[in-house]
């Protein structure tokens, strides 16, 4: 194992954010749970989550909230580090991944969208011929 002392923090990391929204193709577990058309999201702020759900319904862009189920957070415990980045179980991977990310969010409203990076069907206004 190698340790690194990071001496050049980007200025954006020093900002005091009012809101954090991250979007990532983080887990296959979300795709298994939600299928190929509905991204899941997690939030530490219920009011913010409801606003996102409302916007999703108004725009026709589907989203579905999954829980930050704290009972799974013990799966991230490690004897050799503060925590690890993957749970002990082959189940609940989207939740444990979001719980991992949440460890880096302080007292800031936060949304994590775990989305699938490609589509299986050509639809109106979608790219044709390839998958990204």
Predicted regions and their residues:
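A generic structural signal for tightly packed, nonpolar segments enriched in small/aliphatic residues
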Residues: 1-132
């Amino acid at each position: 194992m190698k340790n690194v002392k990071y001496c050049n923090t980007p200025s954006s990391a020093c900002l005091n954010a009012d809101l954090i929204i991250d979007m990532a193709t983080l887990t296959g577990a979300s795709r298994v749970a939600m299928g190929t058309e509905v991204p899941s999201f997690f939030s530490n702020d219920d009011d913010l989550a409801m606003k996102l759900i409302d916007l999703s319904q108004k725009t026709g862009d589907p989203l579905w909230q999954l829980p930050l189920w704290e009972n799974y957070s013990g799966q991230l415990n490690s004897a050799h580090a503060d925590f690890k980045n993957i749970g002990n179980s082959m189940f609940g991977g989207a939740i444990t991944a979001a719980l991992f990310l949440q460890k880096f969010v302080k007292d800031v409203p936060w949304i994590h969208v775990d989305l699938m990076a490609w589509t299986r069907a050509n639809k109106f206004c979608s790219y044709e011929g390839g998958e990204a």
